[in-house]
């Protein structure tokens, strides 16, 4: 099992809409159960800080951006699908590759 990585995440929302609040609640649940406190989450309201959304080229909300560890990943839209979020954060793949029964093909050359 590889050592736990620290995740740095940004969640872009548009105000206190039901969709924004649902995204935040779902994400916090995932983070508390899967990341065990080894993360930093910054919530950015694009209505209050539009310059940050513009700098990061955010076109839709909610958008979850994983900044660290690389590579940078973005999940745009509904965050209620737990598996989709975990795959988007590369967490599900890492768990599968850490499993001794999992086979990962690294080289396709003959």
Swiss-Prot record:
Domain topic, free-text comment: Has 2 forms, fold switches to a thioredoxin-like fold (KaiB(fs)) when bound to KaiC.
Residues spanning the membrane: none
* Species of provenance: Synechococcus sp. (strain RCC307)
Presence of the UniProt keyword Cytoplasm in the record: no
The organism sits in which domain of life?
Answer: Bacteria
Name of the protein in its database record: Circadian clock oscillator protein KaiB
Q: Does the keyword Metal-binding apply?
A: no
The UniProt entry, under InterPro entries, shows: Circ_KaiB, KaiB-like, KaiB_domain, Thioredoxin-like_sf
| Pfam families per record | KaiB
